[in-house]
């Protein structure tokens, strides 16, 4: 299996450990990740798409044409990128008039959208194509952690089009997390937004942090060791947001934040240097130290 790998903007600029873990994981699974040379921003669906649908669709379609030339479906591990590219692909496949309009724009760049490929999310590929049994085979260090899974908004919705899992009571990420040996802990308002999306973080940080703080309180009450997400923007909001909440409101949480790929990386035995967790604002060391201590106490560890 091979797939075109859409990096997006935040992951490779702020959290390169997500990409590193993904490349190692897919190499072990025998899946070839093909780099999309010349890809742009997705662009953000709740920002660009809300005030200039044509420009948004044209930029997204240009990215999709790169994958079409490569003859591969697109994979992203960012909910925003997934939502934007999936929605644009669906729109242009269904709306012939819009497709013709966008192709007139793309013609100026020597490109044409053909509607030949699909847009997919990392988590969905791991669950449906790889499968839990095969994924469990790459786990070398089972993780005895209690984690709060954050689904985010664009991974499952609009559910009529995306149709990955039940949008209100999903289990796909919980099951993927538990392959690593970690426990997905239920918590209040689990499906609530991280607070950053739709331009809210840029427009009114206090409002965005109010959402984040509510989720963090619920997670803390559930007694979790870490937060696991499938979106670098949500990742940033929980990671950087904890520092901002501390500065603005004086409330501390100190809950480490990991992308699903990084959690799987830990379970594969990757060192923290490869996961680039030092780039995180919230220190992950306490979480890693807990795992090391459990390893030392495990029967047969010597």
From Swiss-Prot:
**Tell me, how does this one assemble?**
The heterodisulfide reductase is composed of three subunits; HdrA, HdrB and HdrC. It forms a complex with the F420-non-reducing hydrogenase (Mvh), which provides the reducing equivalents to the heterodisulfide reductase.
User: From which residue to which does any coiled coil extend?
Assistant: none
Stored Pfam families = CCG
Catalytic activity of the protein: coenzyme B + coenzyme M + 2 reduced [2Fe-2S]-[ferredoxin] + 2 H(+) = coenzyme M-coenzyme B heterodisulfide + 2 H2 + 2 oxidized [2Fe-2S]-[ferredoxin]
What's the stated role of this polypeptide? Part of a complex that catalyzes the reversible reduction of CoM-S-S-CoB to the thiol-coenzymes H-S-CoM (coenzyme M) and H-S-CoB (coenzyme B).
| Superkingdom, natural source | Archaea
Copy the pathway line from the protein's UniProt record.
Cofactor metabolism; coenzyme M-coenzyme B heterodisulfide reduction; coenzyme B and coenzyme M from coenzyme M-coenzyme B heterodisulfide: step 1/1
GO MF terms, alphabetically ordered: CoB--CoM heterodisulfide reductase activity
Provide the GO biological process annotations: methanogenesis
Which top EC class is named for this enzyme in its record? Answer: oxidoreductase
Tell me the protein family, please: Belongs to the HdrB family.
Protein's recorded name: H(2):CoB-CoM heterodisulfide,ferredoxin reductase subunit B
Keywords in alphabetical order? Methanogenesis, Oxidoreductase
**EC number per UniProt:** 1.8.98.5
Tell whether Phosphoprotein is among the UniProt keywords.
Answer: no
